[in-house]
């Protein structure tokens, strides 16, 4: 969220009046927000009051109540970040010469925007989408709405939770949750709120939560819909996680922390408990007739796209009834719904389930209606199949690189060459690799420690997730080393871990997020610089991301914890000869040689992450 404090400075010919502070989070959806219908009584020289405002594109229009007491005034509107940094002045000049209250209207181009990602910085890009929230000295009102354009999401780091399994409202860490029972275990929005310090302590700037809409209530052959993917009514909430007030409170608390909210949604299907022939369509809303769904057929041929899009997922325990998204009425209903969903619950981004099961031309108008960042699940490792979906959605989950990453690091001596090849392939196949969702685990895939218990291999795979191209996504429990395999074992309750903030992987993930966030803070072109491989061999890959002076060099290996100690010499790092760089995981200083080569001390198969010493000063990284 873009958290901004505006203040109105009133400059008089004779004296300077006190500053009147108003706290905003702006959006650009052209909605007029009324603050005061008439001026409030004031004390002292508080003679400027905001009556209404709207942000339309980059134009701020507003009306002010201004009171003059025998001297002219020029009212200038500035903005101030929450950390106290003054942003660009908005060009508003109001000469006032009457001796009473007057309502002045004005319009100005917002010359800048403020993005808060840990540390504040001024961003000259005014094309971003803002959110409105208002806390004035004399009156209070609020309108909670979305913020997250694709450009803003690039710099985020996402912590994914299965809402039911992350944290309970009562804070219990002993409540029993047997994954094989497949029942609701009591995780909630309030539970997440209570644990945001835990999440933010790892450096995350966004969370992704389970689908929020009402699901079928039945105890099916696969248990209950605790995961949220078995829709029944898209206009109602799944109250097992909490009510509307709880969800809004979660969004508000995230936004107060400068964090974003991503919500998982399903468009492709509704669910039924029982045989496909017995589906009761009247139970669904808003599509309460069979006319809105594809005729029954199971998906049997994934090489046939028509079969993939128009036939049904699931089985006769839980058939997933396929919505006919080719119908204009369905398209318009979904577009209207997603706008309302986002506005009602202050959603900043969407993860979209089963994207490849909906015809591709559905997605561009849907994303336009949403108006925020969307990342689609295209469950396929072939970039020639997956990447074209980025023509219609901002991003897709990076399954093409997920499989080579697992292959490279799940065992000693895995295939590094396949990973190198895929990194290069994606640059030509995908429209923008920096908007892909980079992940190692999720609710649909086995946890990485189910493949290996070797901490060095696990650390290398996590480092790739966070420091390569794309928006990093860490699945809840990775920081505690959870090791469940396929569904349902990868959907464990987190609370038995006690939410340790001193575990090996908690501290490790925090360090990686910290250096990434710092590189973005120093120069946000780090985000659009495409990661490239500067060295590889059968056991090692070294990557550079970031322009000269702000580049992170990441060196990964699959030698495992028993790997020997040796020195790897790297060229093409872009580091200046004789400059000092820090390996930020061990806080070791290394001097680049006269030829610009970097001597990398490798040991125990552990990853190495380098950054220029000169850019670390004041960061707190390695006590700098």
Curated annotation (Swiss-Prot):
It is an enzyme of class 3 (hydrolase). GO terms for cellular component: extracellular region. Its EC number is 3.2.1.1. It catalyses: Endohydrolysis of (1->4)-alpha-D-glucosidic linkages in polysaccharides containing three or more (1->4)-alpha-linked D-glucose units. Ca(2+) 1 binds at residues 268, 309, 322, 357. The active site is at residues 353, 377. Its main location: secreted. Ca(2+) 2 binds at residues 353, 377. InterPro entries: A-amylase-like, A_amylase_C_dom, CBM21_dom, Glyco_hydro_13_cat_dom, Glyco_hydro_b, Glycoside_hydrolase_SF. The record marks 444 as: Transition state stabilizer. Pfam families: A_amylase_dom_C, Alpha-amylase. Disulfide bonds join 177-185, 297-311, 387-430, 587-622. SMART domains: Aamy. Glycans are attached at residues 304, 344. Substrate binds at residues 230, 269, 351, 356-357, 381, 444, 491. The keyword DNA-binding does not apply. Residues 1-28 form the signal peptide. It is found in: Secreted. Its cofactor is Ca(2+). GO terms for biological process: carbohydrate catabolic process. Keywords: Calcium, Carbohydrate metabolism, Disulfide bond, Glycoprotein, Glycosidase, Hydrolase, Metal-binding, Secreted, Signal. Gene3D superfamilies: Glycosidases, Golgi alpha-mannosidase II. Belongs to the glycosyl hydrolase 13 family. This is Alpha-amylase 1.
